């Protein structure tokens, strides 16, 4: 049965671009977002006809753009990365910062939790990758064979059988690091422009990367090789695998593309109706993506400060 995505509603509350989105399996009615307005918002999702949800709590503390956010697997904590050079660990029930992570010497662009929530990895414009414990202690800084430009994205593999960290950089490289030794395992070479994002499939077997060259490259993390590429035809800002379908979603400068990885074809392309923009201004772009845990809703954060929720439906 062919499927498509339909716009279900919007979430409005940020006063800056929505830079990152995170969902929780433990709390399906919660969405977390980060923004250039220096805050994170915890949303309560109601999915009503009139309103898709409302801001339950605003997380304040960062003194600059918040670039990335993730939720712990138990749904109790969130991590945020900021251009103020720090990370913060938040208790979601109270909205308080429980730890600040200080050590990067430039904007922090990305943060990720390990599968057991005991380790944290961050990537920065200082070109380093740092490993932390949840107490805020930096346990290791990866610089040897590291990125020669900004580290744009870092992600832990969810697969305990192959414990690796994947990173991407403005040096056009995807790097795979062995978690046990923090040593470089593989350099994945192929992109012709800076890379904005990497994402790992739910089973940890696949990694996808994308950026300036408009190509999504898929890598086999178990075999350490390039599998194939999918053309998005425009700069890629964000990538996310579906939790329950063999799909990869790409947020590009012009639309959101849903790829079927089995057929290597487009399932759908999402472009909301934007209010008319002047000749000089650009249409809003999607720069962040997250699936609901059940894979039925795709959340998309835009440069018009709005989060849009798309629902998977069967094509009539």
UniProtKB/Swiss-Prot annotation:
InterPro entries attached to this UniProt entry: G-protein_beta_WD-40_rep, RACK1-like, WD40/YVTN_repeat-like_dom_sf, WD40_repeat_CS, WD40_repeat_dom_sf, WD40_rpt
GO MF terms held by the record: G-protein alpha-subunit binding; GDP-dissociation inhibitor activity; protein-membrane adaptor activity; ribosome binding; signaling receptor activator activity; structural constituent of ribosome; translation regulator activity
Disruption phenotype: Abolishes the pathogenicity.
WD repeat start-end pairs: 13-53, 61-100, 103-142, 146-187, 190-229, 231-269, 281-316
Domain of life: Eukaryota
A biological-process GO annotation: G protein-coupled receptor signaling pathway
Gene3D superfamilies named among the record's database cross-references: YVTN repeat-like/Quinoprotein amine dehydrogenase
Keywords: Repeat, Virulence, WD repeat
GO CC annotations, alphabetized: cytosolic small ribosomal subunit
Coiled-coil regions listed in the entry: none
Assembly and interaction partners: Interacts with MST50 and MCK1.
Family the UniProt entry places it in: Belongs to the WD repeat G protein beta family. Ribosomal protein RACK1 subfamily.
PANTHER family: RECEPTOR FOR ACTIVATED PROTEIN KINASE C RACK1 (PTHR19868)
Chain's role: Involved in regulating the cell wall integrity and MPS1 activation via its interaction with the MAPKKK MCK1.
Identification of the protein by name: MST50-interacting protein 11
Origin species: Pyricularia oryzae (strain 70-15 / ATCC MYA-4617 / FGSC 8958)
């Amino acid at each position: 049965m062919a499927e498509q995505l339909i716009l279900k509603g919007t979430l409005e509350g940020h006063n800056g671009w929505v830079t990152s989105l995170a969902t929780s399996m433990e709390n399906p009615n919660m969405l977390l977002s980060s923004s250039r307005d220096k805050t994170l918002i915890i949303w309560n999702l109601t999915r009503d006809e009139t309103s898709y949800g409302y801001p339950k709590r605003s997380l304040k503390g960062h003194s600059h753009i918040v670039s990335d956010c993730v939720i712990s697997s138990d749904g109790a904590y969130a991590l945020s990365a900021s251009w103020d050079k720090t990370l913060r660990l938040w208790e979601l029930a109270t909205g308080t910062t429980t730890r600040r992570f200080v050590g990067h010497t430039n904007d922090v662009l990305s943060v990720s939790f390990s599968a057991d929530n005991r380790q944290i990895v961050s990537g920065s414009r200082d070109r380093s990758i740092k490993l932390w414990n949840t107490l805020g202690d930096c346990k290791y800084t990866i610089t040897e064979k590291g990125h020669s430009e900004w580290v744009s994205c870092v992600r832990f593999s969810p697969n305990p059988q192959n414990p690796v960290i994947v990173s991407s950089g403005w040096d056009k490289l995807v790097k795979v690091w062995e978690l046990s030794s923090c040593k470089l395992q593989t350099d994945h070479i192929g992109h012709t422009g800076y890379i904005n994002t990497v994402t790992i499939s739910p089973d940890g077997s696949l990694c996808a990367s994308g950026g300036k060259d408009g190509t999504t490259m898929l890598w086999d993390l178990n075999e350490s090789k390039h599998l194939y590429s999918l053309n998005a035809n425009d700069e890629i800002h964000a990538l996310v695998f579906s939790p329950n379908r063999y799909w990869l979603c790409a947020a590009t400068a012009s639309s959101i593309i849903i790829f079927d990885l089995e057929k290597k074809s487009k399932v759908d392309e999402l472009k909301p109706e934007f209010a008319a923009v002047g000749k000089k201004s650009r249409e809003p772009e999607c720069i962040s993506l997250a699936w609901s845990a059940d894979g039925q809703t795709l959340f998309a954060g835009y440069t018009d400060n709005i989060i849009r929720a798309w629902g998977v439906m069967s094509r009539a």
